[in-house]
Amino acid sequence: MSRHDEIKASYKQLGNTGTLYDGIVTRSTLIGKLLDSLVWGLDKELAAKWIEDALAPIPENFAGKLLEVPVGTGVLTMPLYKKLAGADITCLDYSADMMKNAERRAEAMGASNVRFVQGDVGALPFRDEQFDIVLSLNGFHAFPDKDAAFRETCRVLKPGGVFCGCFYIRGEFGRTDWFVKHMYVPKGFFTPPFETRESLMRRLDGLYSRAEVHTVKSEGIFCCKK
């Protein structure tokens, strides 16, 4: 089995148990709260902070073109997209099962400005300089070809556009690093190598005119301007 297939199989398990995944991300279930505390060292306030910080670069009145990759179940972003009625939003994911959850959520919420595309972040099916914002929440630590993913997300972004989001970075919180190495990587949820705060800053500086990185425990939160 190729690494791509391993990751697809792992995320298929999550896609088929969307409520479990959503509970972990939003801390809305007991297991979600336990994992946030045990694995990530997060309490309620810190968990809310990384989400707020990652989404902060998106203006409240945004009416341009936005690409989210990967969309996952859409639990964090569909409520936002419903409010951005004037925006043209495209959501891409490698896992059809995860994306089905997002599609159902968008339909239930009446987010009619969102379309869904199955695809690979390492070979995005979009033309150059197509989007005003590219958003990526907790995806890069799972992508098999991170170099291609960084190149492609930059390629489809318009000059002056914003690339923002978050993902796991190593070296910030030892307990998280241990769980990632001994549990998340063997299960195929995360794929090494992983960035540090310093290596991520160097990488983004090489691609963008301006880049900012800060952390909430092991969440590396970034905002870049092309």
Regions found by a protein language model. Give the residues of each.
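A short SAM/SAH-binding and catalytic strip from SAM-dependent methyltransferases
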Residues: 133-145
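C-terminal alpha-helical "lid/dimerization" subdomain adjacent to the S-adenosyl-L-methionine
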Residues: 24, 44, 164-216, 220-222
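Short N-terminal helix/helix-N-cap motif within the alpha/beta-hydrolase-1
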Residues: 97, 144-148
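Class I SAM-dependent methyltransferase SAM/SAH-binding core
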Residues: 65-123
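A short glycine-rich, Lys/Arg-flanked "PGG" loop and its adjoining helix->strand segment in the class I
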Residues: 147-159
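A generic alpha-to-beta junction signature in SAM-dependent methyltransferases
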Residues: 58-60, 83-84, 157
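A short acidic, Gly/Pro-enriched loop at the edge of an enzyme's catalytic core
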Residues: 122-133
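Conserved class I S-adenosyl-L-methionine
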Residues: 1-60, 79, 181-184
